[in-house]
């Protein structure tokens, strides 16, 4: 990989990875997916697992063609930078919820500032009672210590429920995660506002920062963010 290359990073079960339409050699593993737009067609991608370590450069909420609203975080490493996109909403289940990886990032981001050095990895060891990996991102500071949220799980609003009887006299419970969703989305908005405030302070203190940093991030993102299915 070339120096200062921007890697578009995604998350799958237990790891960060980058995706390519071409086999780039050592470490790249072939993956096959059904094309959601043409179900009779099989798409081929090559994945390579990566770790994220570097300096926090950029945080935003963006729109993705396939995933809707996403959290976008850019971390600058020594030889390459990492653009991590995480969908805010998880539409795969019967109840509309915020994405669990997103939730874990929001908690850590409360205590991360632009310029902080961090290390990030995806949980690959801890399982729930149903033997499923917990879907969370672990973030460490420059001293290797866990960056925790400012809130406890007991402070997160619970899902709402309502019961109705169907025509057979059976009681059906309908779940609504909107209180929980709003909590995490509001927290993310607060974090974004804090990052924007830091940017304004830097630019007012040193006008050169706007010229040196912002265009390089944006141009790199545009050059390396070819629209593709989220595989």
What is each PLM-predicted segment?
Residues 1-85, 93, 97-110, 125-166, ...:
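OB-fold ssDNA-binding interfaces and closely related basic DNA-contact patches used
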Residues 212-231:
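Short acidic, low-complexity intrinsically disordered linear motifs used
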Residues 191-210:
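Intrinsically disordered, low-complexity mixed-charge segments
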Residues 6, 206-208, 214:
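Low-complexity, intrinsically disordered short peptide segments enriched in small/polar/basic residues
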């Amino acid at each position: 990989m070339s120096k200062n290359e921007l890697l578009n990073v995604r998350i799958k079960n237990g790891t960060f990875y980058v995706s390519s339409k071409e086999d780039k050699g050592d470490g790249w593993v072939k993956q096959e997916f059904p094309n959601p737009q043409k179900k009779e067609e099989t798409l081929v991608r090559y994945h390579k697992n990566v770790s994220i370590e570097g300096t926090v450069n950029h945080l935003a909420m963006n729109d993705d063609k396939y995933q809707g609203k996403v959290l976008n975080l850019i971390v600058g490493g020594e030889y390459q930078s990492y653009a991590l996109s995480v969908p805010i909403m998880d539409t795969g289940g019967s109840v509309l919820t915020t994405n669990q990886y997103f939730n874990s990032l929001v908690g850590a981001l409360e205590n991360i500032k632009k310029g902080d050095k961090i290390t990030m990895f995806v949980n690959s060891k801890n399982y729930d009672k149903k033997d499923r990996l917990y879907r969370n991102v672990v973030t460490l500071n420059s001293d290797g210590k866990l960056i925790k949220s400012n809130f406890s799980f007991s402070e997160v609003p619970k899902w709402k429920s309502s019961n109705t009887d169907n025509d057979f006299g059976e009681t059906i419970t309908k779940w609504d995660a909107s209180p929980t969703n709003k909590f995490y989305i509001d927290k993310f908005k607060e974090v974004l506002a804090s990052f924007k405030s830091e940017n304004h302070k830097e630019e007012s203190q040193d006008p050169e920062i706007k010229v040196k940093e912002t265009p390089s991030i944006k141009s790199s993102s545009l050059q390396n963010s070819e629209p593709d299915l989220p595989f």
